[in-house]
């Protein structure tokens, strides 16, 4: 993680301005030129360019602009080839009228004493002293501190949001992995082995045979009782509720702990004998149901022929 530089680290040192005098006079834009230091080489988010964009979005970029131009003015003032008149023109046009004068386009929040010094220089057509310009720069740096703290907070917030989103997706993956591995911690393998041991006797085919034989026997008994009590009951009504018996058999098969059902089928016979006494007992569709229907039809035919005789 990149370290957070101080405000001085990103403001100083500035490159020496290599523009000509004519360019300095005609320039109305801010040119923030920094020597690429450690934070620039490391592509740090804390750069002067990003700080300036942050201030510009907040409509408070005037302090940073004044700092840059005042620093350039001091560098220009060290050039002995520049005349006093030229320095005065650059100061008044690029700094005083734009950032210091009352109701200027980008008026900075200077103290009354500092403003009076510059107003006096402007009225007397004098170039301000270096010490006065340095005091103004120092004051502006104090004003920039608040904006820089907000800038650093915004960068950290963005970095935290990105990190949180990444950690959130990683946490979801961890939860998935944890839920997958938690089954083994509950001993599912042991449960599966125990369940398989119950299903060994009898096997699937043997169990199906027991169920079919039991169902067939119960069907014959049910046919007799139903023909005696309700001979007019149609086969279509028997088909409508066949799923009830099927679901009952399925629920019985889903209880491997009942070894009596799986080993001998006695428990299943008892349940079927109890269920067959109910008038609503119906057989499932398929081979058993067709066999039941054929027996009912044959029985009805026999009764009709007997009555005709």
Swiss-Prot record:
Judging by the UniProt lineage, the source's domain of life is Eukaryota
Residue ranges annotated as compositionally biased, kind Low complexity, are: 231-252
Start-end of Polar residues biased regions: 213-223, 253-262
Ranges for the region named Disordered are: 213-264
Q: Which PROSITE patterns match?
A: RGS
| SUPFAM superfamilies recorded | Regulator of G-protein signaling, RGS (SSF48097)
Q: Which UniProt keywords apply?
A: Cytoplasm, Nucleus
Using the UniProt record, give the first listed, main subcellular location: cytoplasm
Question: What's the protein here called?
Answer: Regulator of G-protein signaling 2
């Amino acid at each position: 993680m990149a370290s957070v530089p101080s405000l001085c680290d990103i403001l100083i040192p500035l490159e020496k301005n290599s523009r000509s005098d004519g360019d300095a006079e005609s320039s109305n834009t801010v040119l923030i030129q920094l020597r690429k230091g450690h934070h620039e080489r490391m592509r740090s988010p804390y750069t002067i360019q990003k700080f300036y964009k942050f201030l510009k979005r907040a409509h408070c970029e005037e302090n940073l602009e004044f700092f840059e131009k005042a620093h350039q003015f001091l560098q220009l003032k060290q050039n002995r080839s520049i005349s006093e008149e030229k320095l005065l023109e650059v100061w008044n046009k690029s700094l005083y009228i734009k950032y210091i004068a009352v109701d200027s386009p980008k008026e900075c929040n200077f103290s009354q004493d500092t403003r009076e010094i510059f107003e006096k220089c402007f009225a007397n057509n004098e170039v301000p002293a270096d010490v006065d310009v340095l005091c103004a720069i120092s004051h502006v740096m104090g004003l920039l501190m608040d904006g820089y703290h907000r800038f650093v907070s915004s960068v950290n917030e963005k970095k935290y949001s990105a990190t949180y989103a990444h950690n959130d997706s990683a946490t979801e993956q961890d939860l998935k992995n944890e839920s997958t591995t938690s089954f083994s911690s509950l001993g599912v393998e042991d449960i599966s082995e125990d369940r398989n041991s119950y299903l060994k006797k009898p096997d699937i085919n043997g169990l199906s045979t027991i169920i079919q034989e039991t169902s067939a026997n119960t069907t014959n008994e049910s046919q007799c009782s139903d023909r005696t009590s309700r001979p007019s009951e149609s086969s279509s009504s028997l088909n409508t509720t066949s799923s009830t018996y099927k679901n009952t058999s399925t629920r019985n098969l889903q209880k491997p702990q009942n070894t009596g059902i799986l080993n001998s089928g006695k428990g299943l016979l008892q349940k079927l004998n109890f269920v067959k006494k109910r008038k609503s007992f119906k057989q499932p569709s398929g081979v058993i149901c067709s066999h039941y229907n054929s027996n009912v039809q044959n029985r009805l035919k026999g009764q009709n022929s007997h009555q005709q005789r």
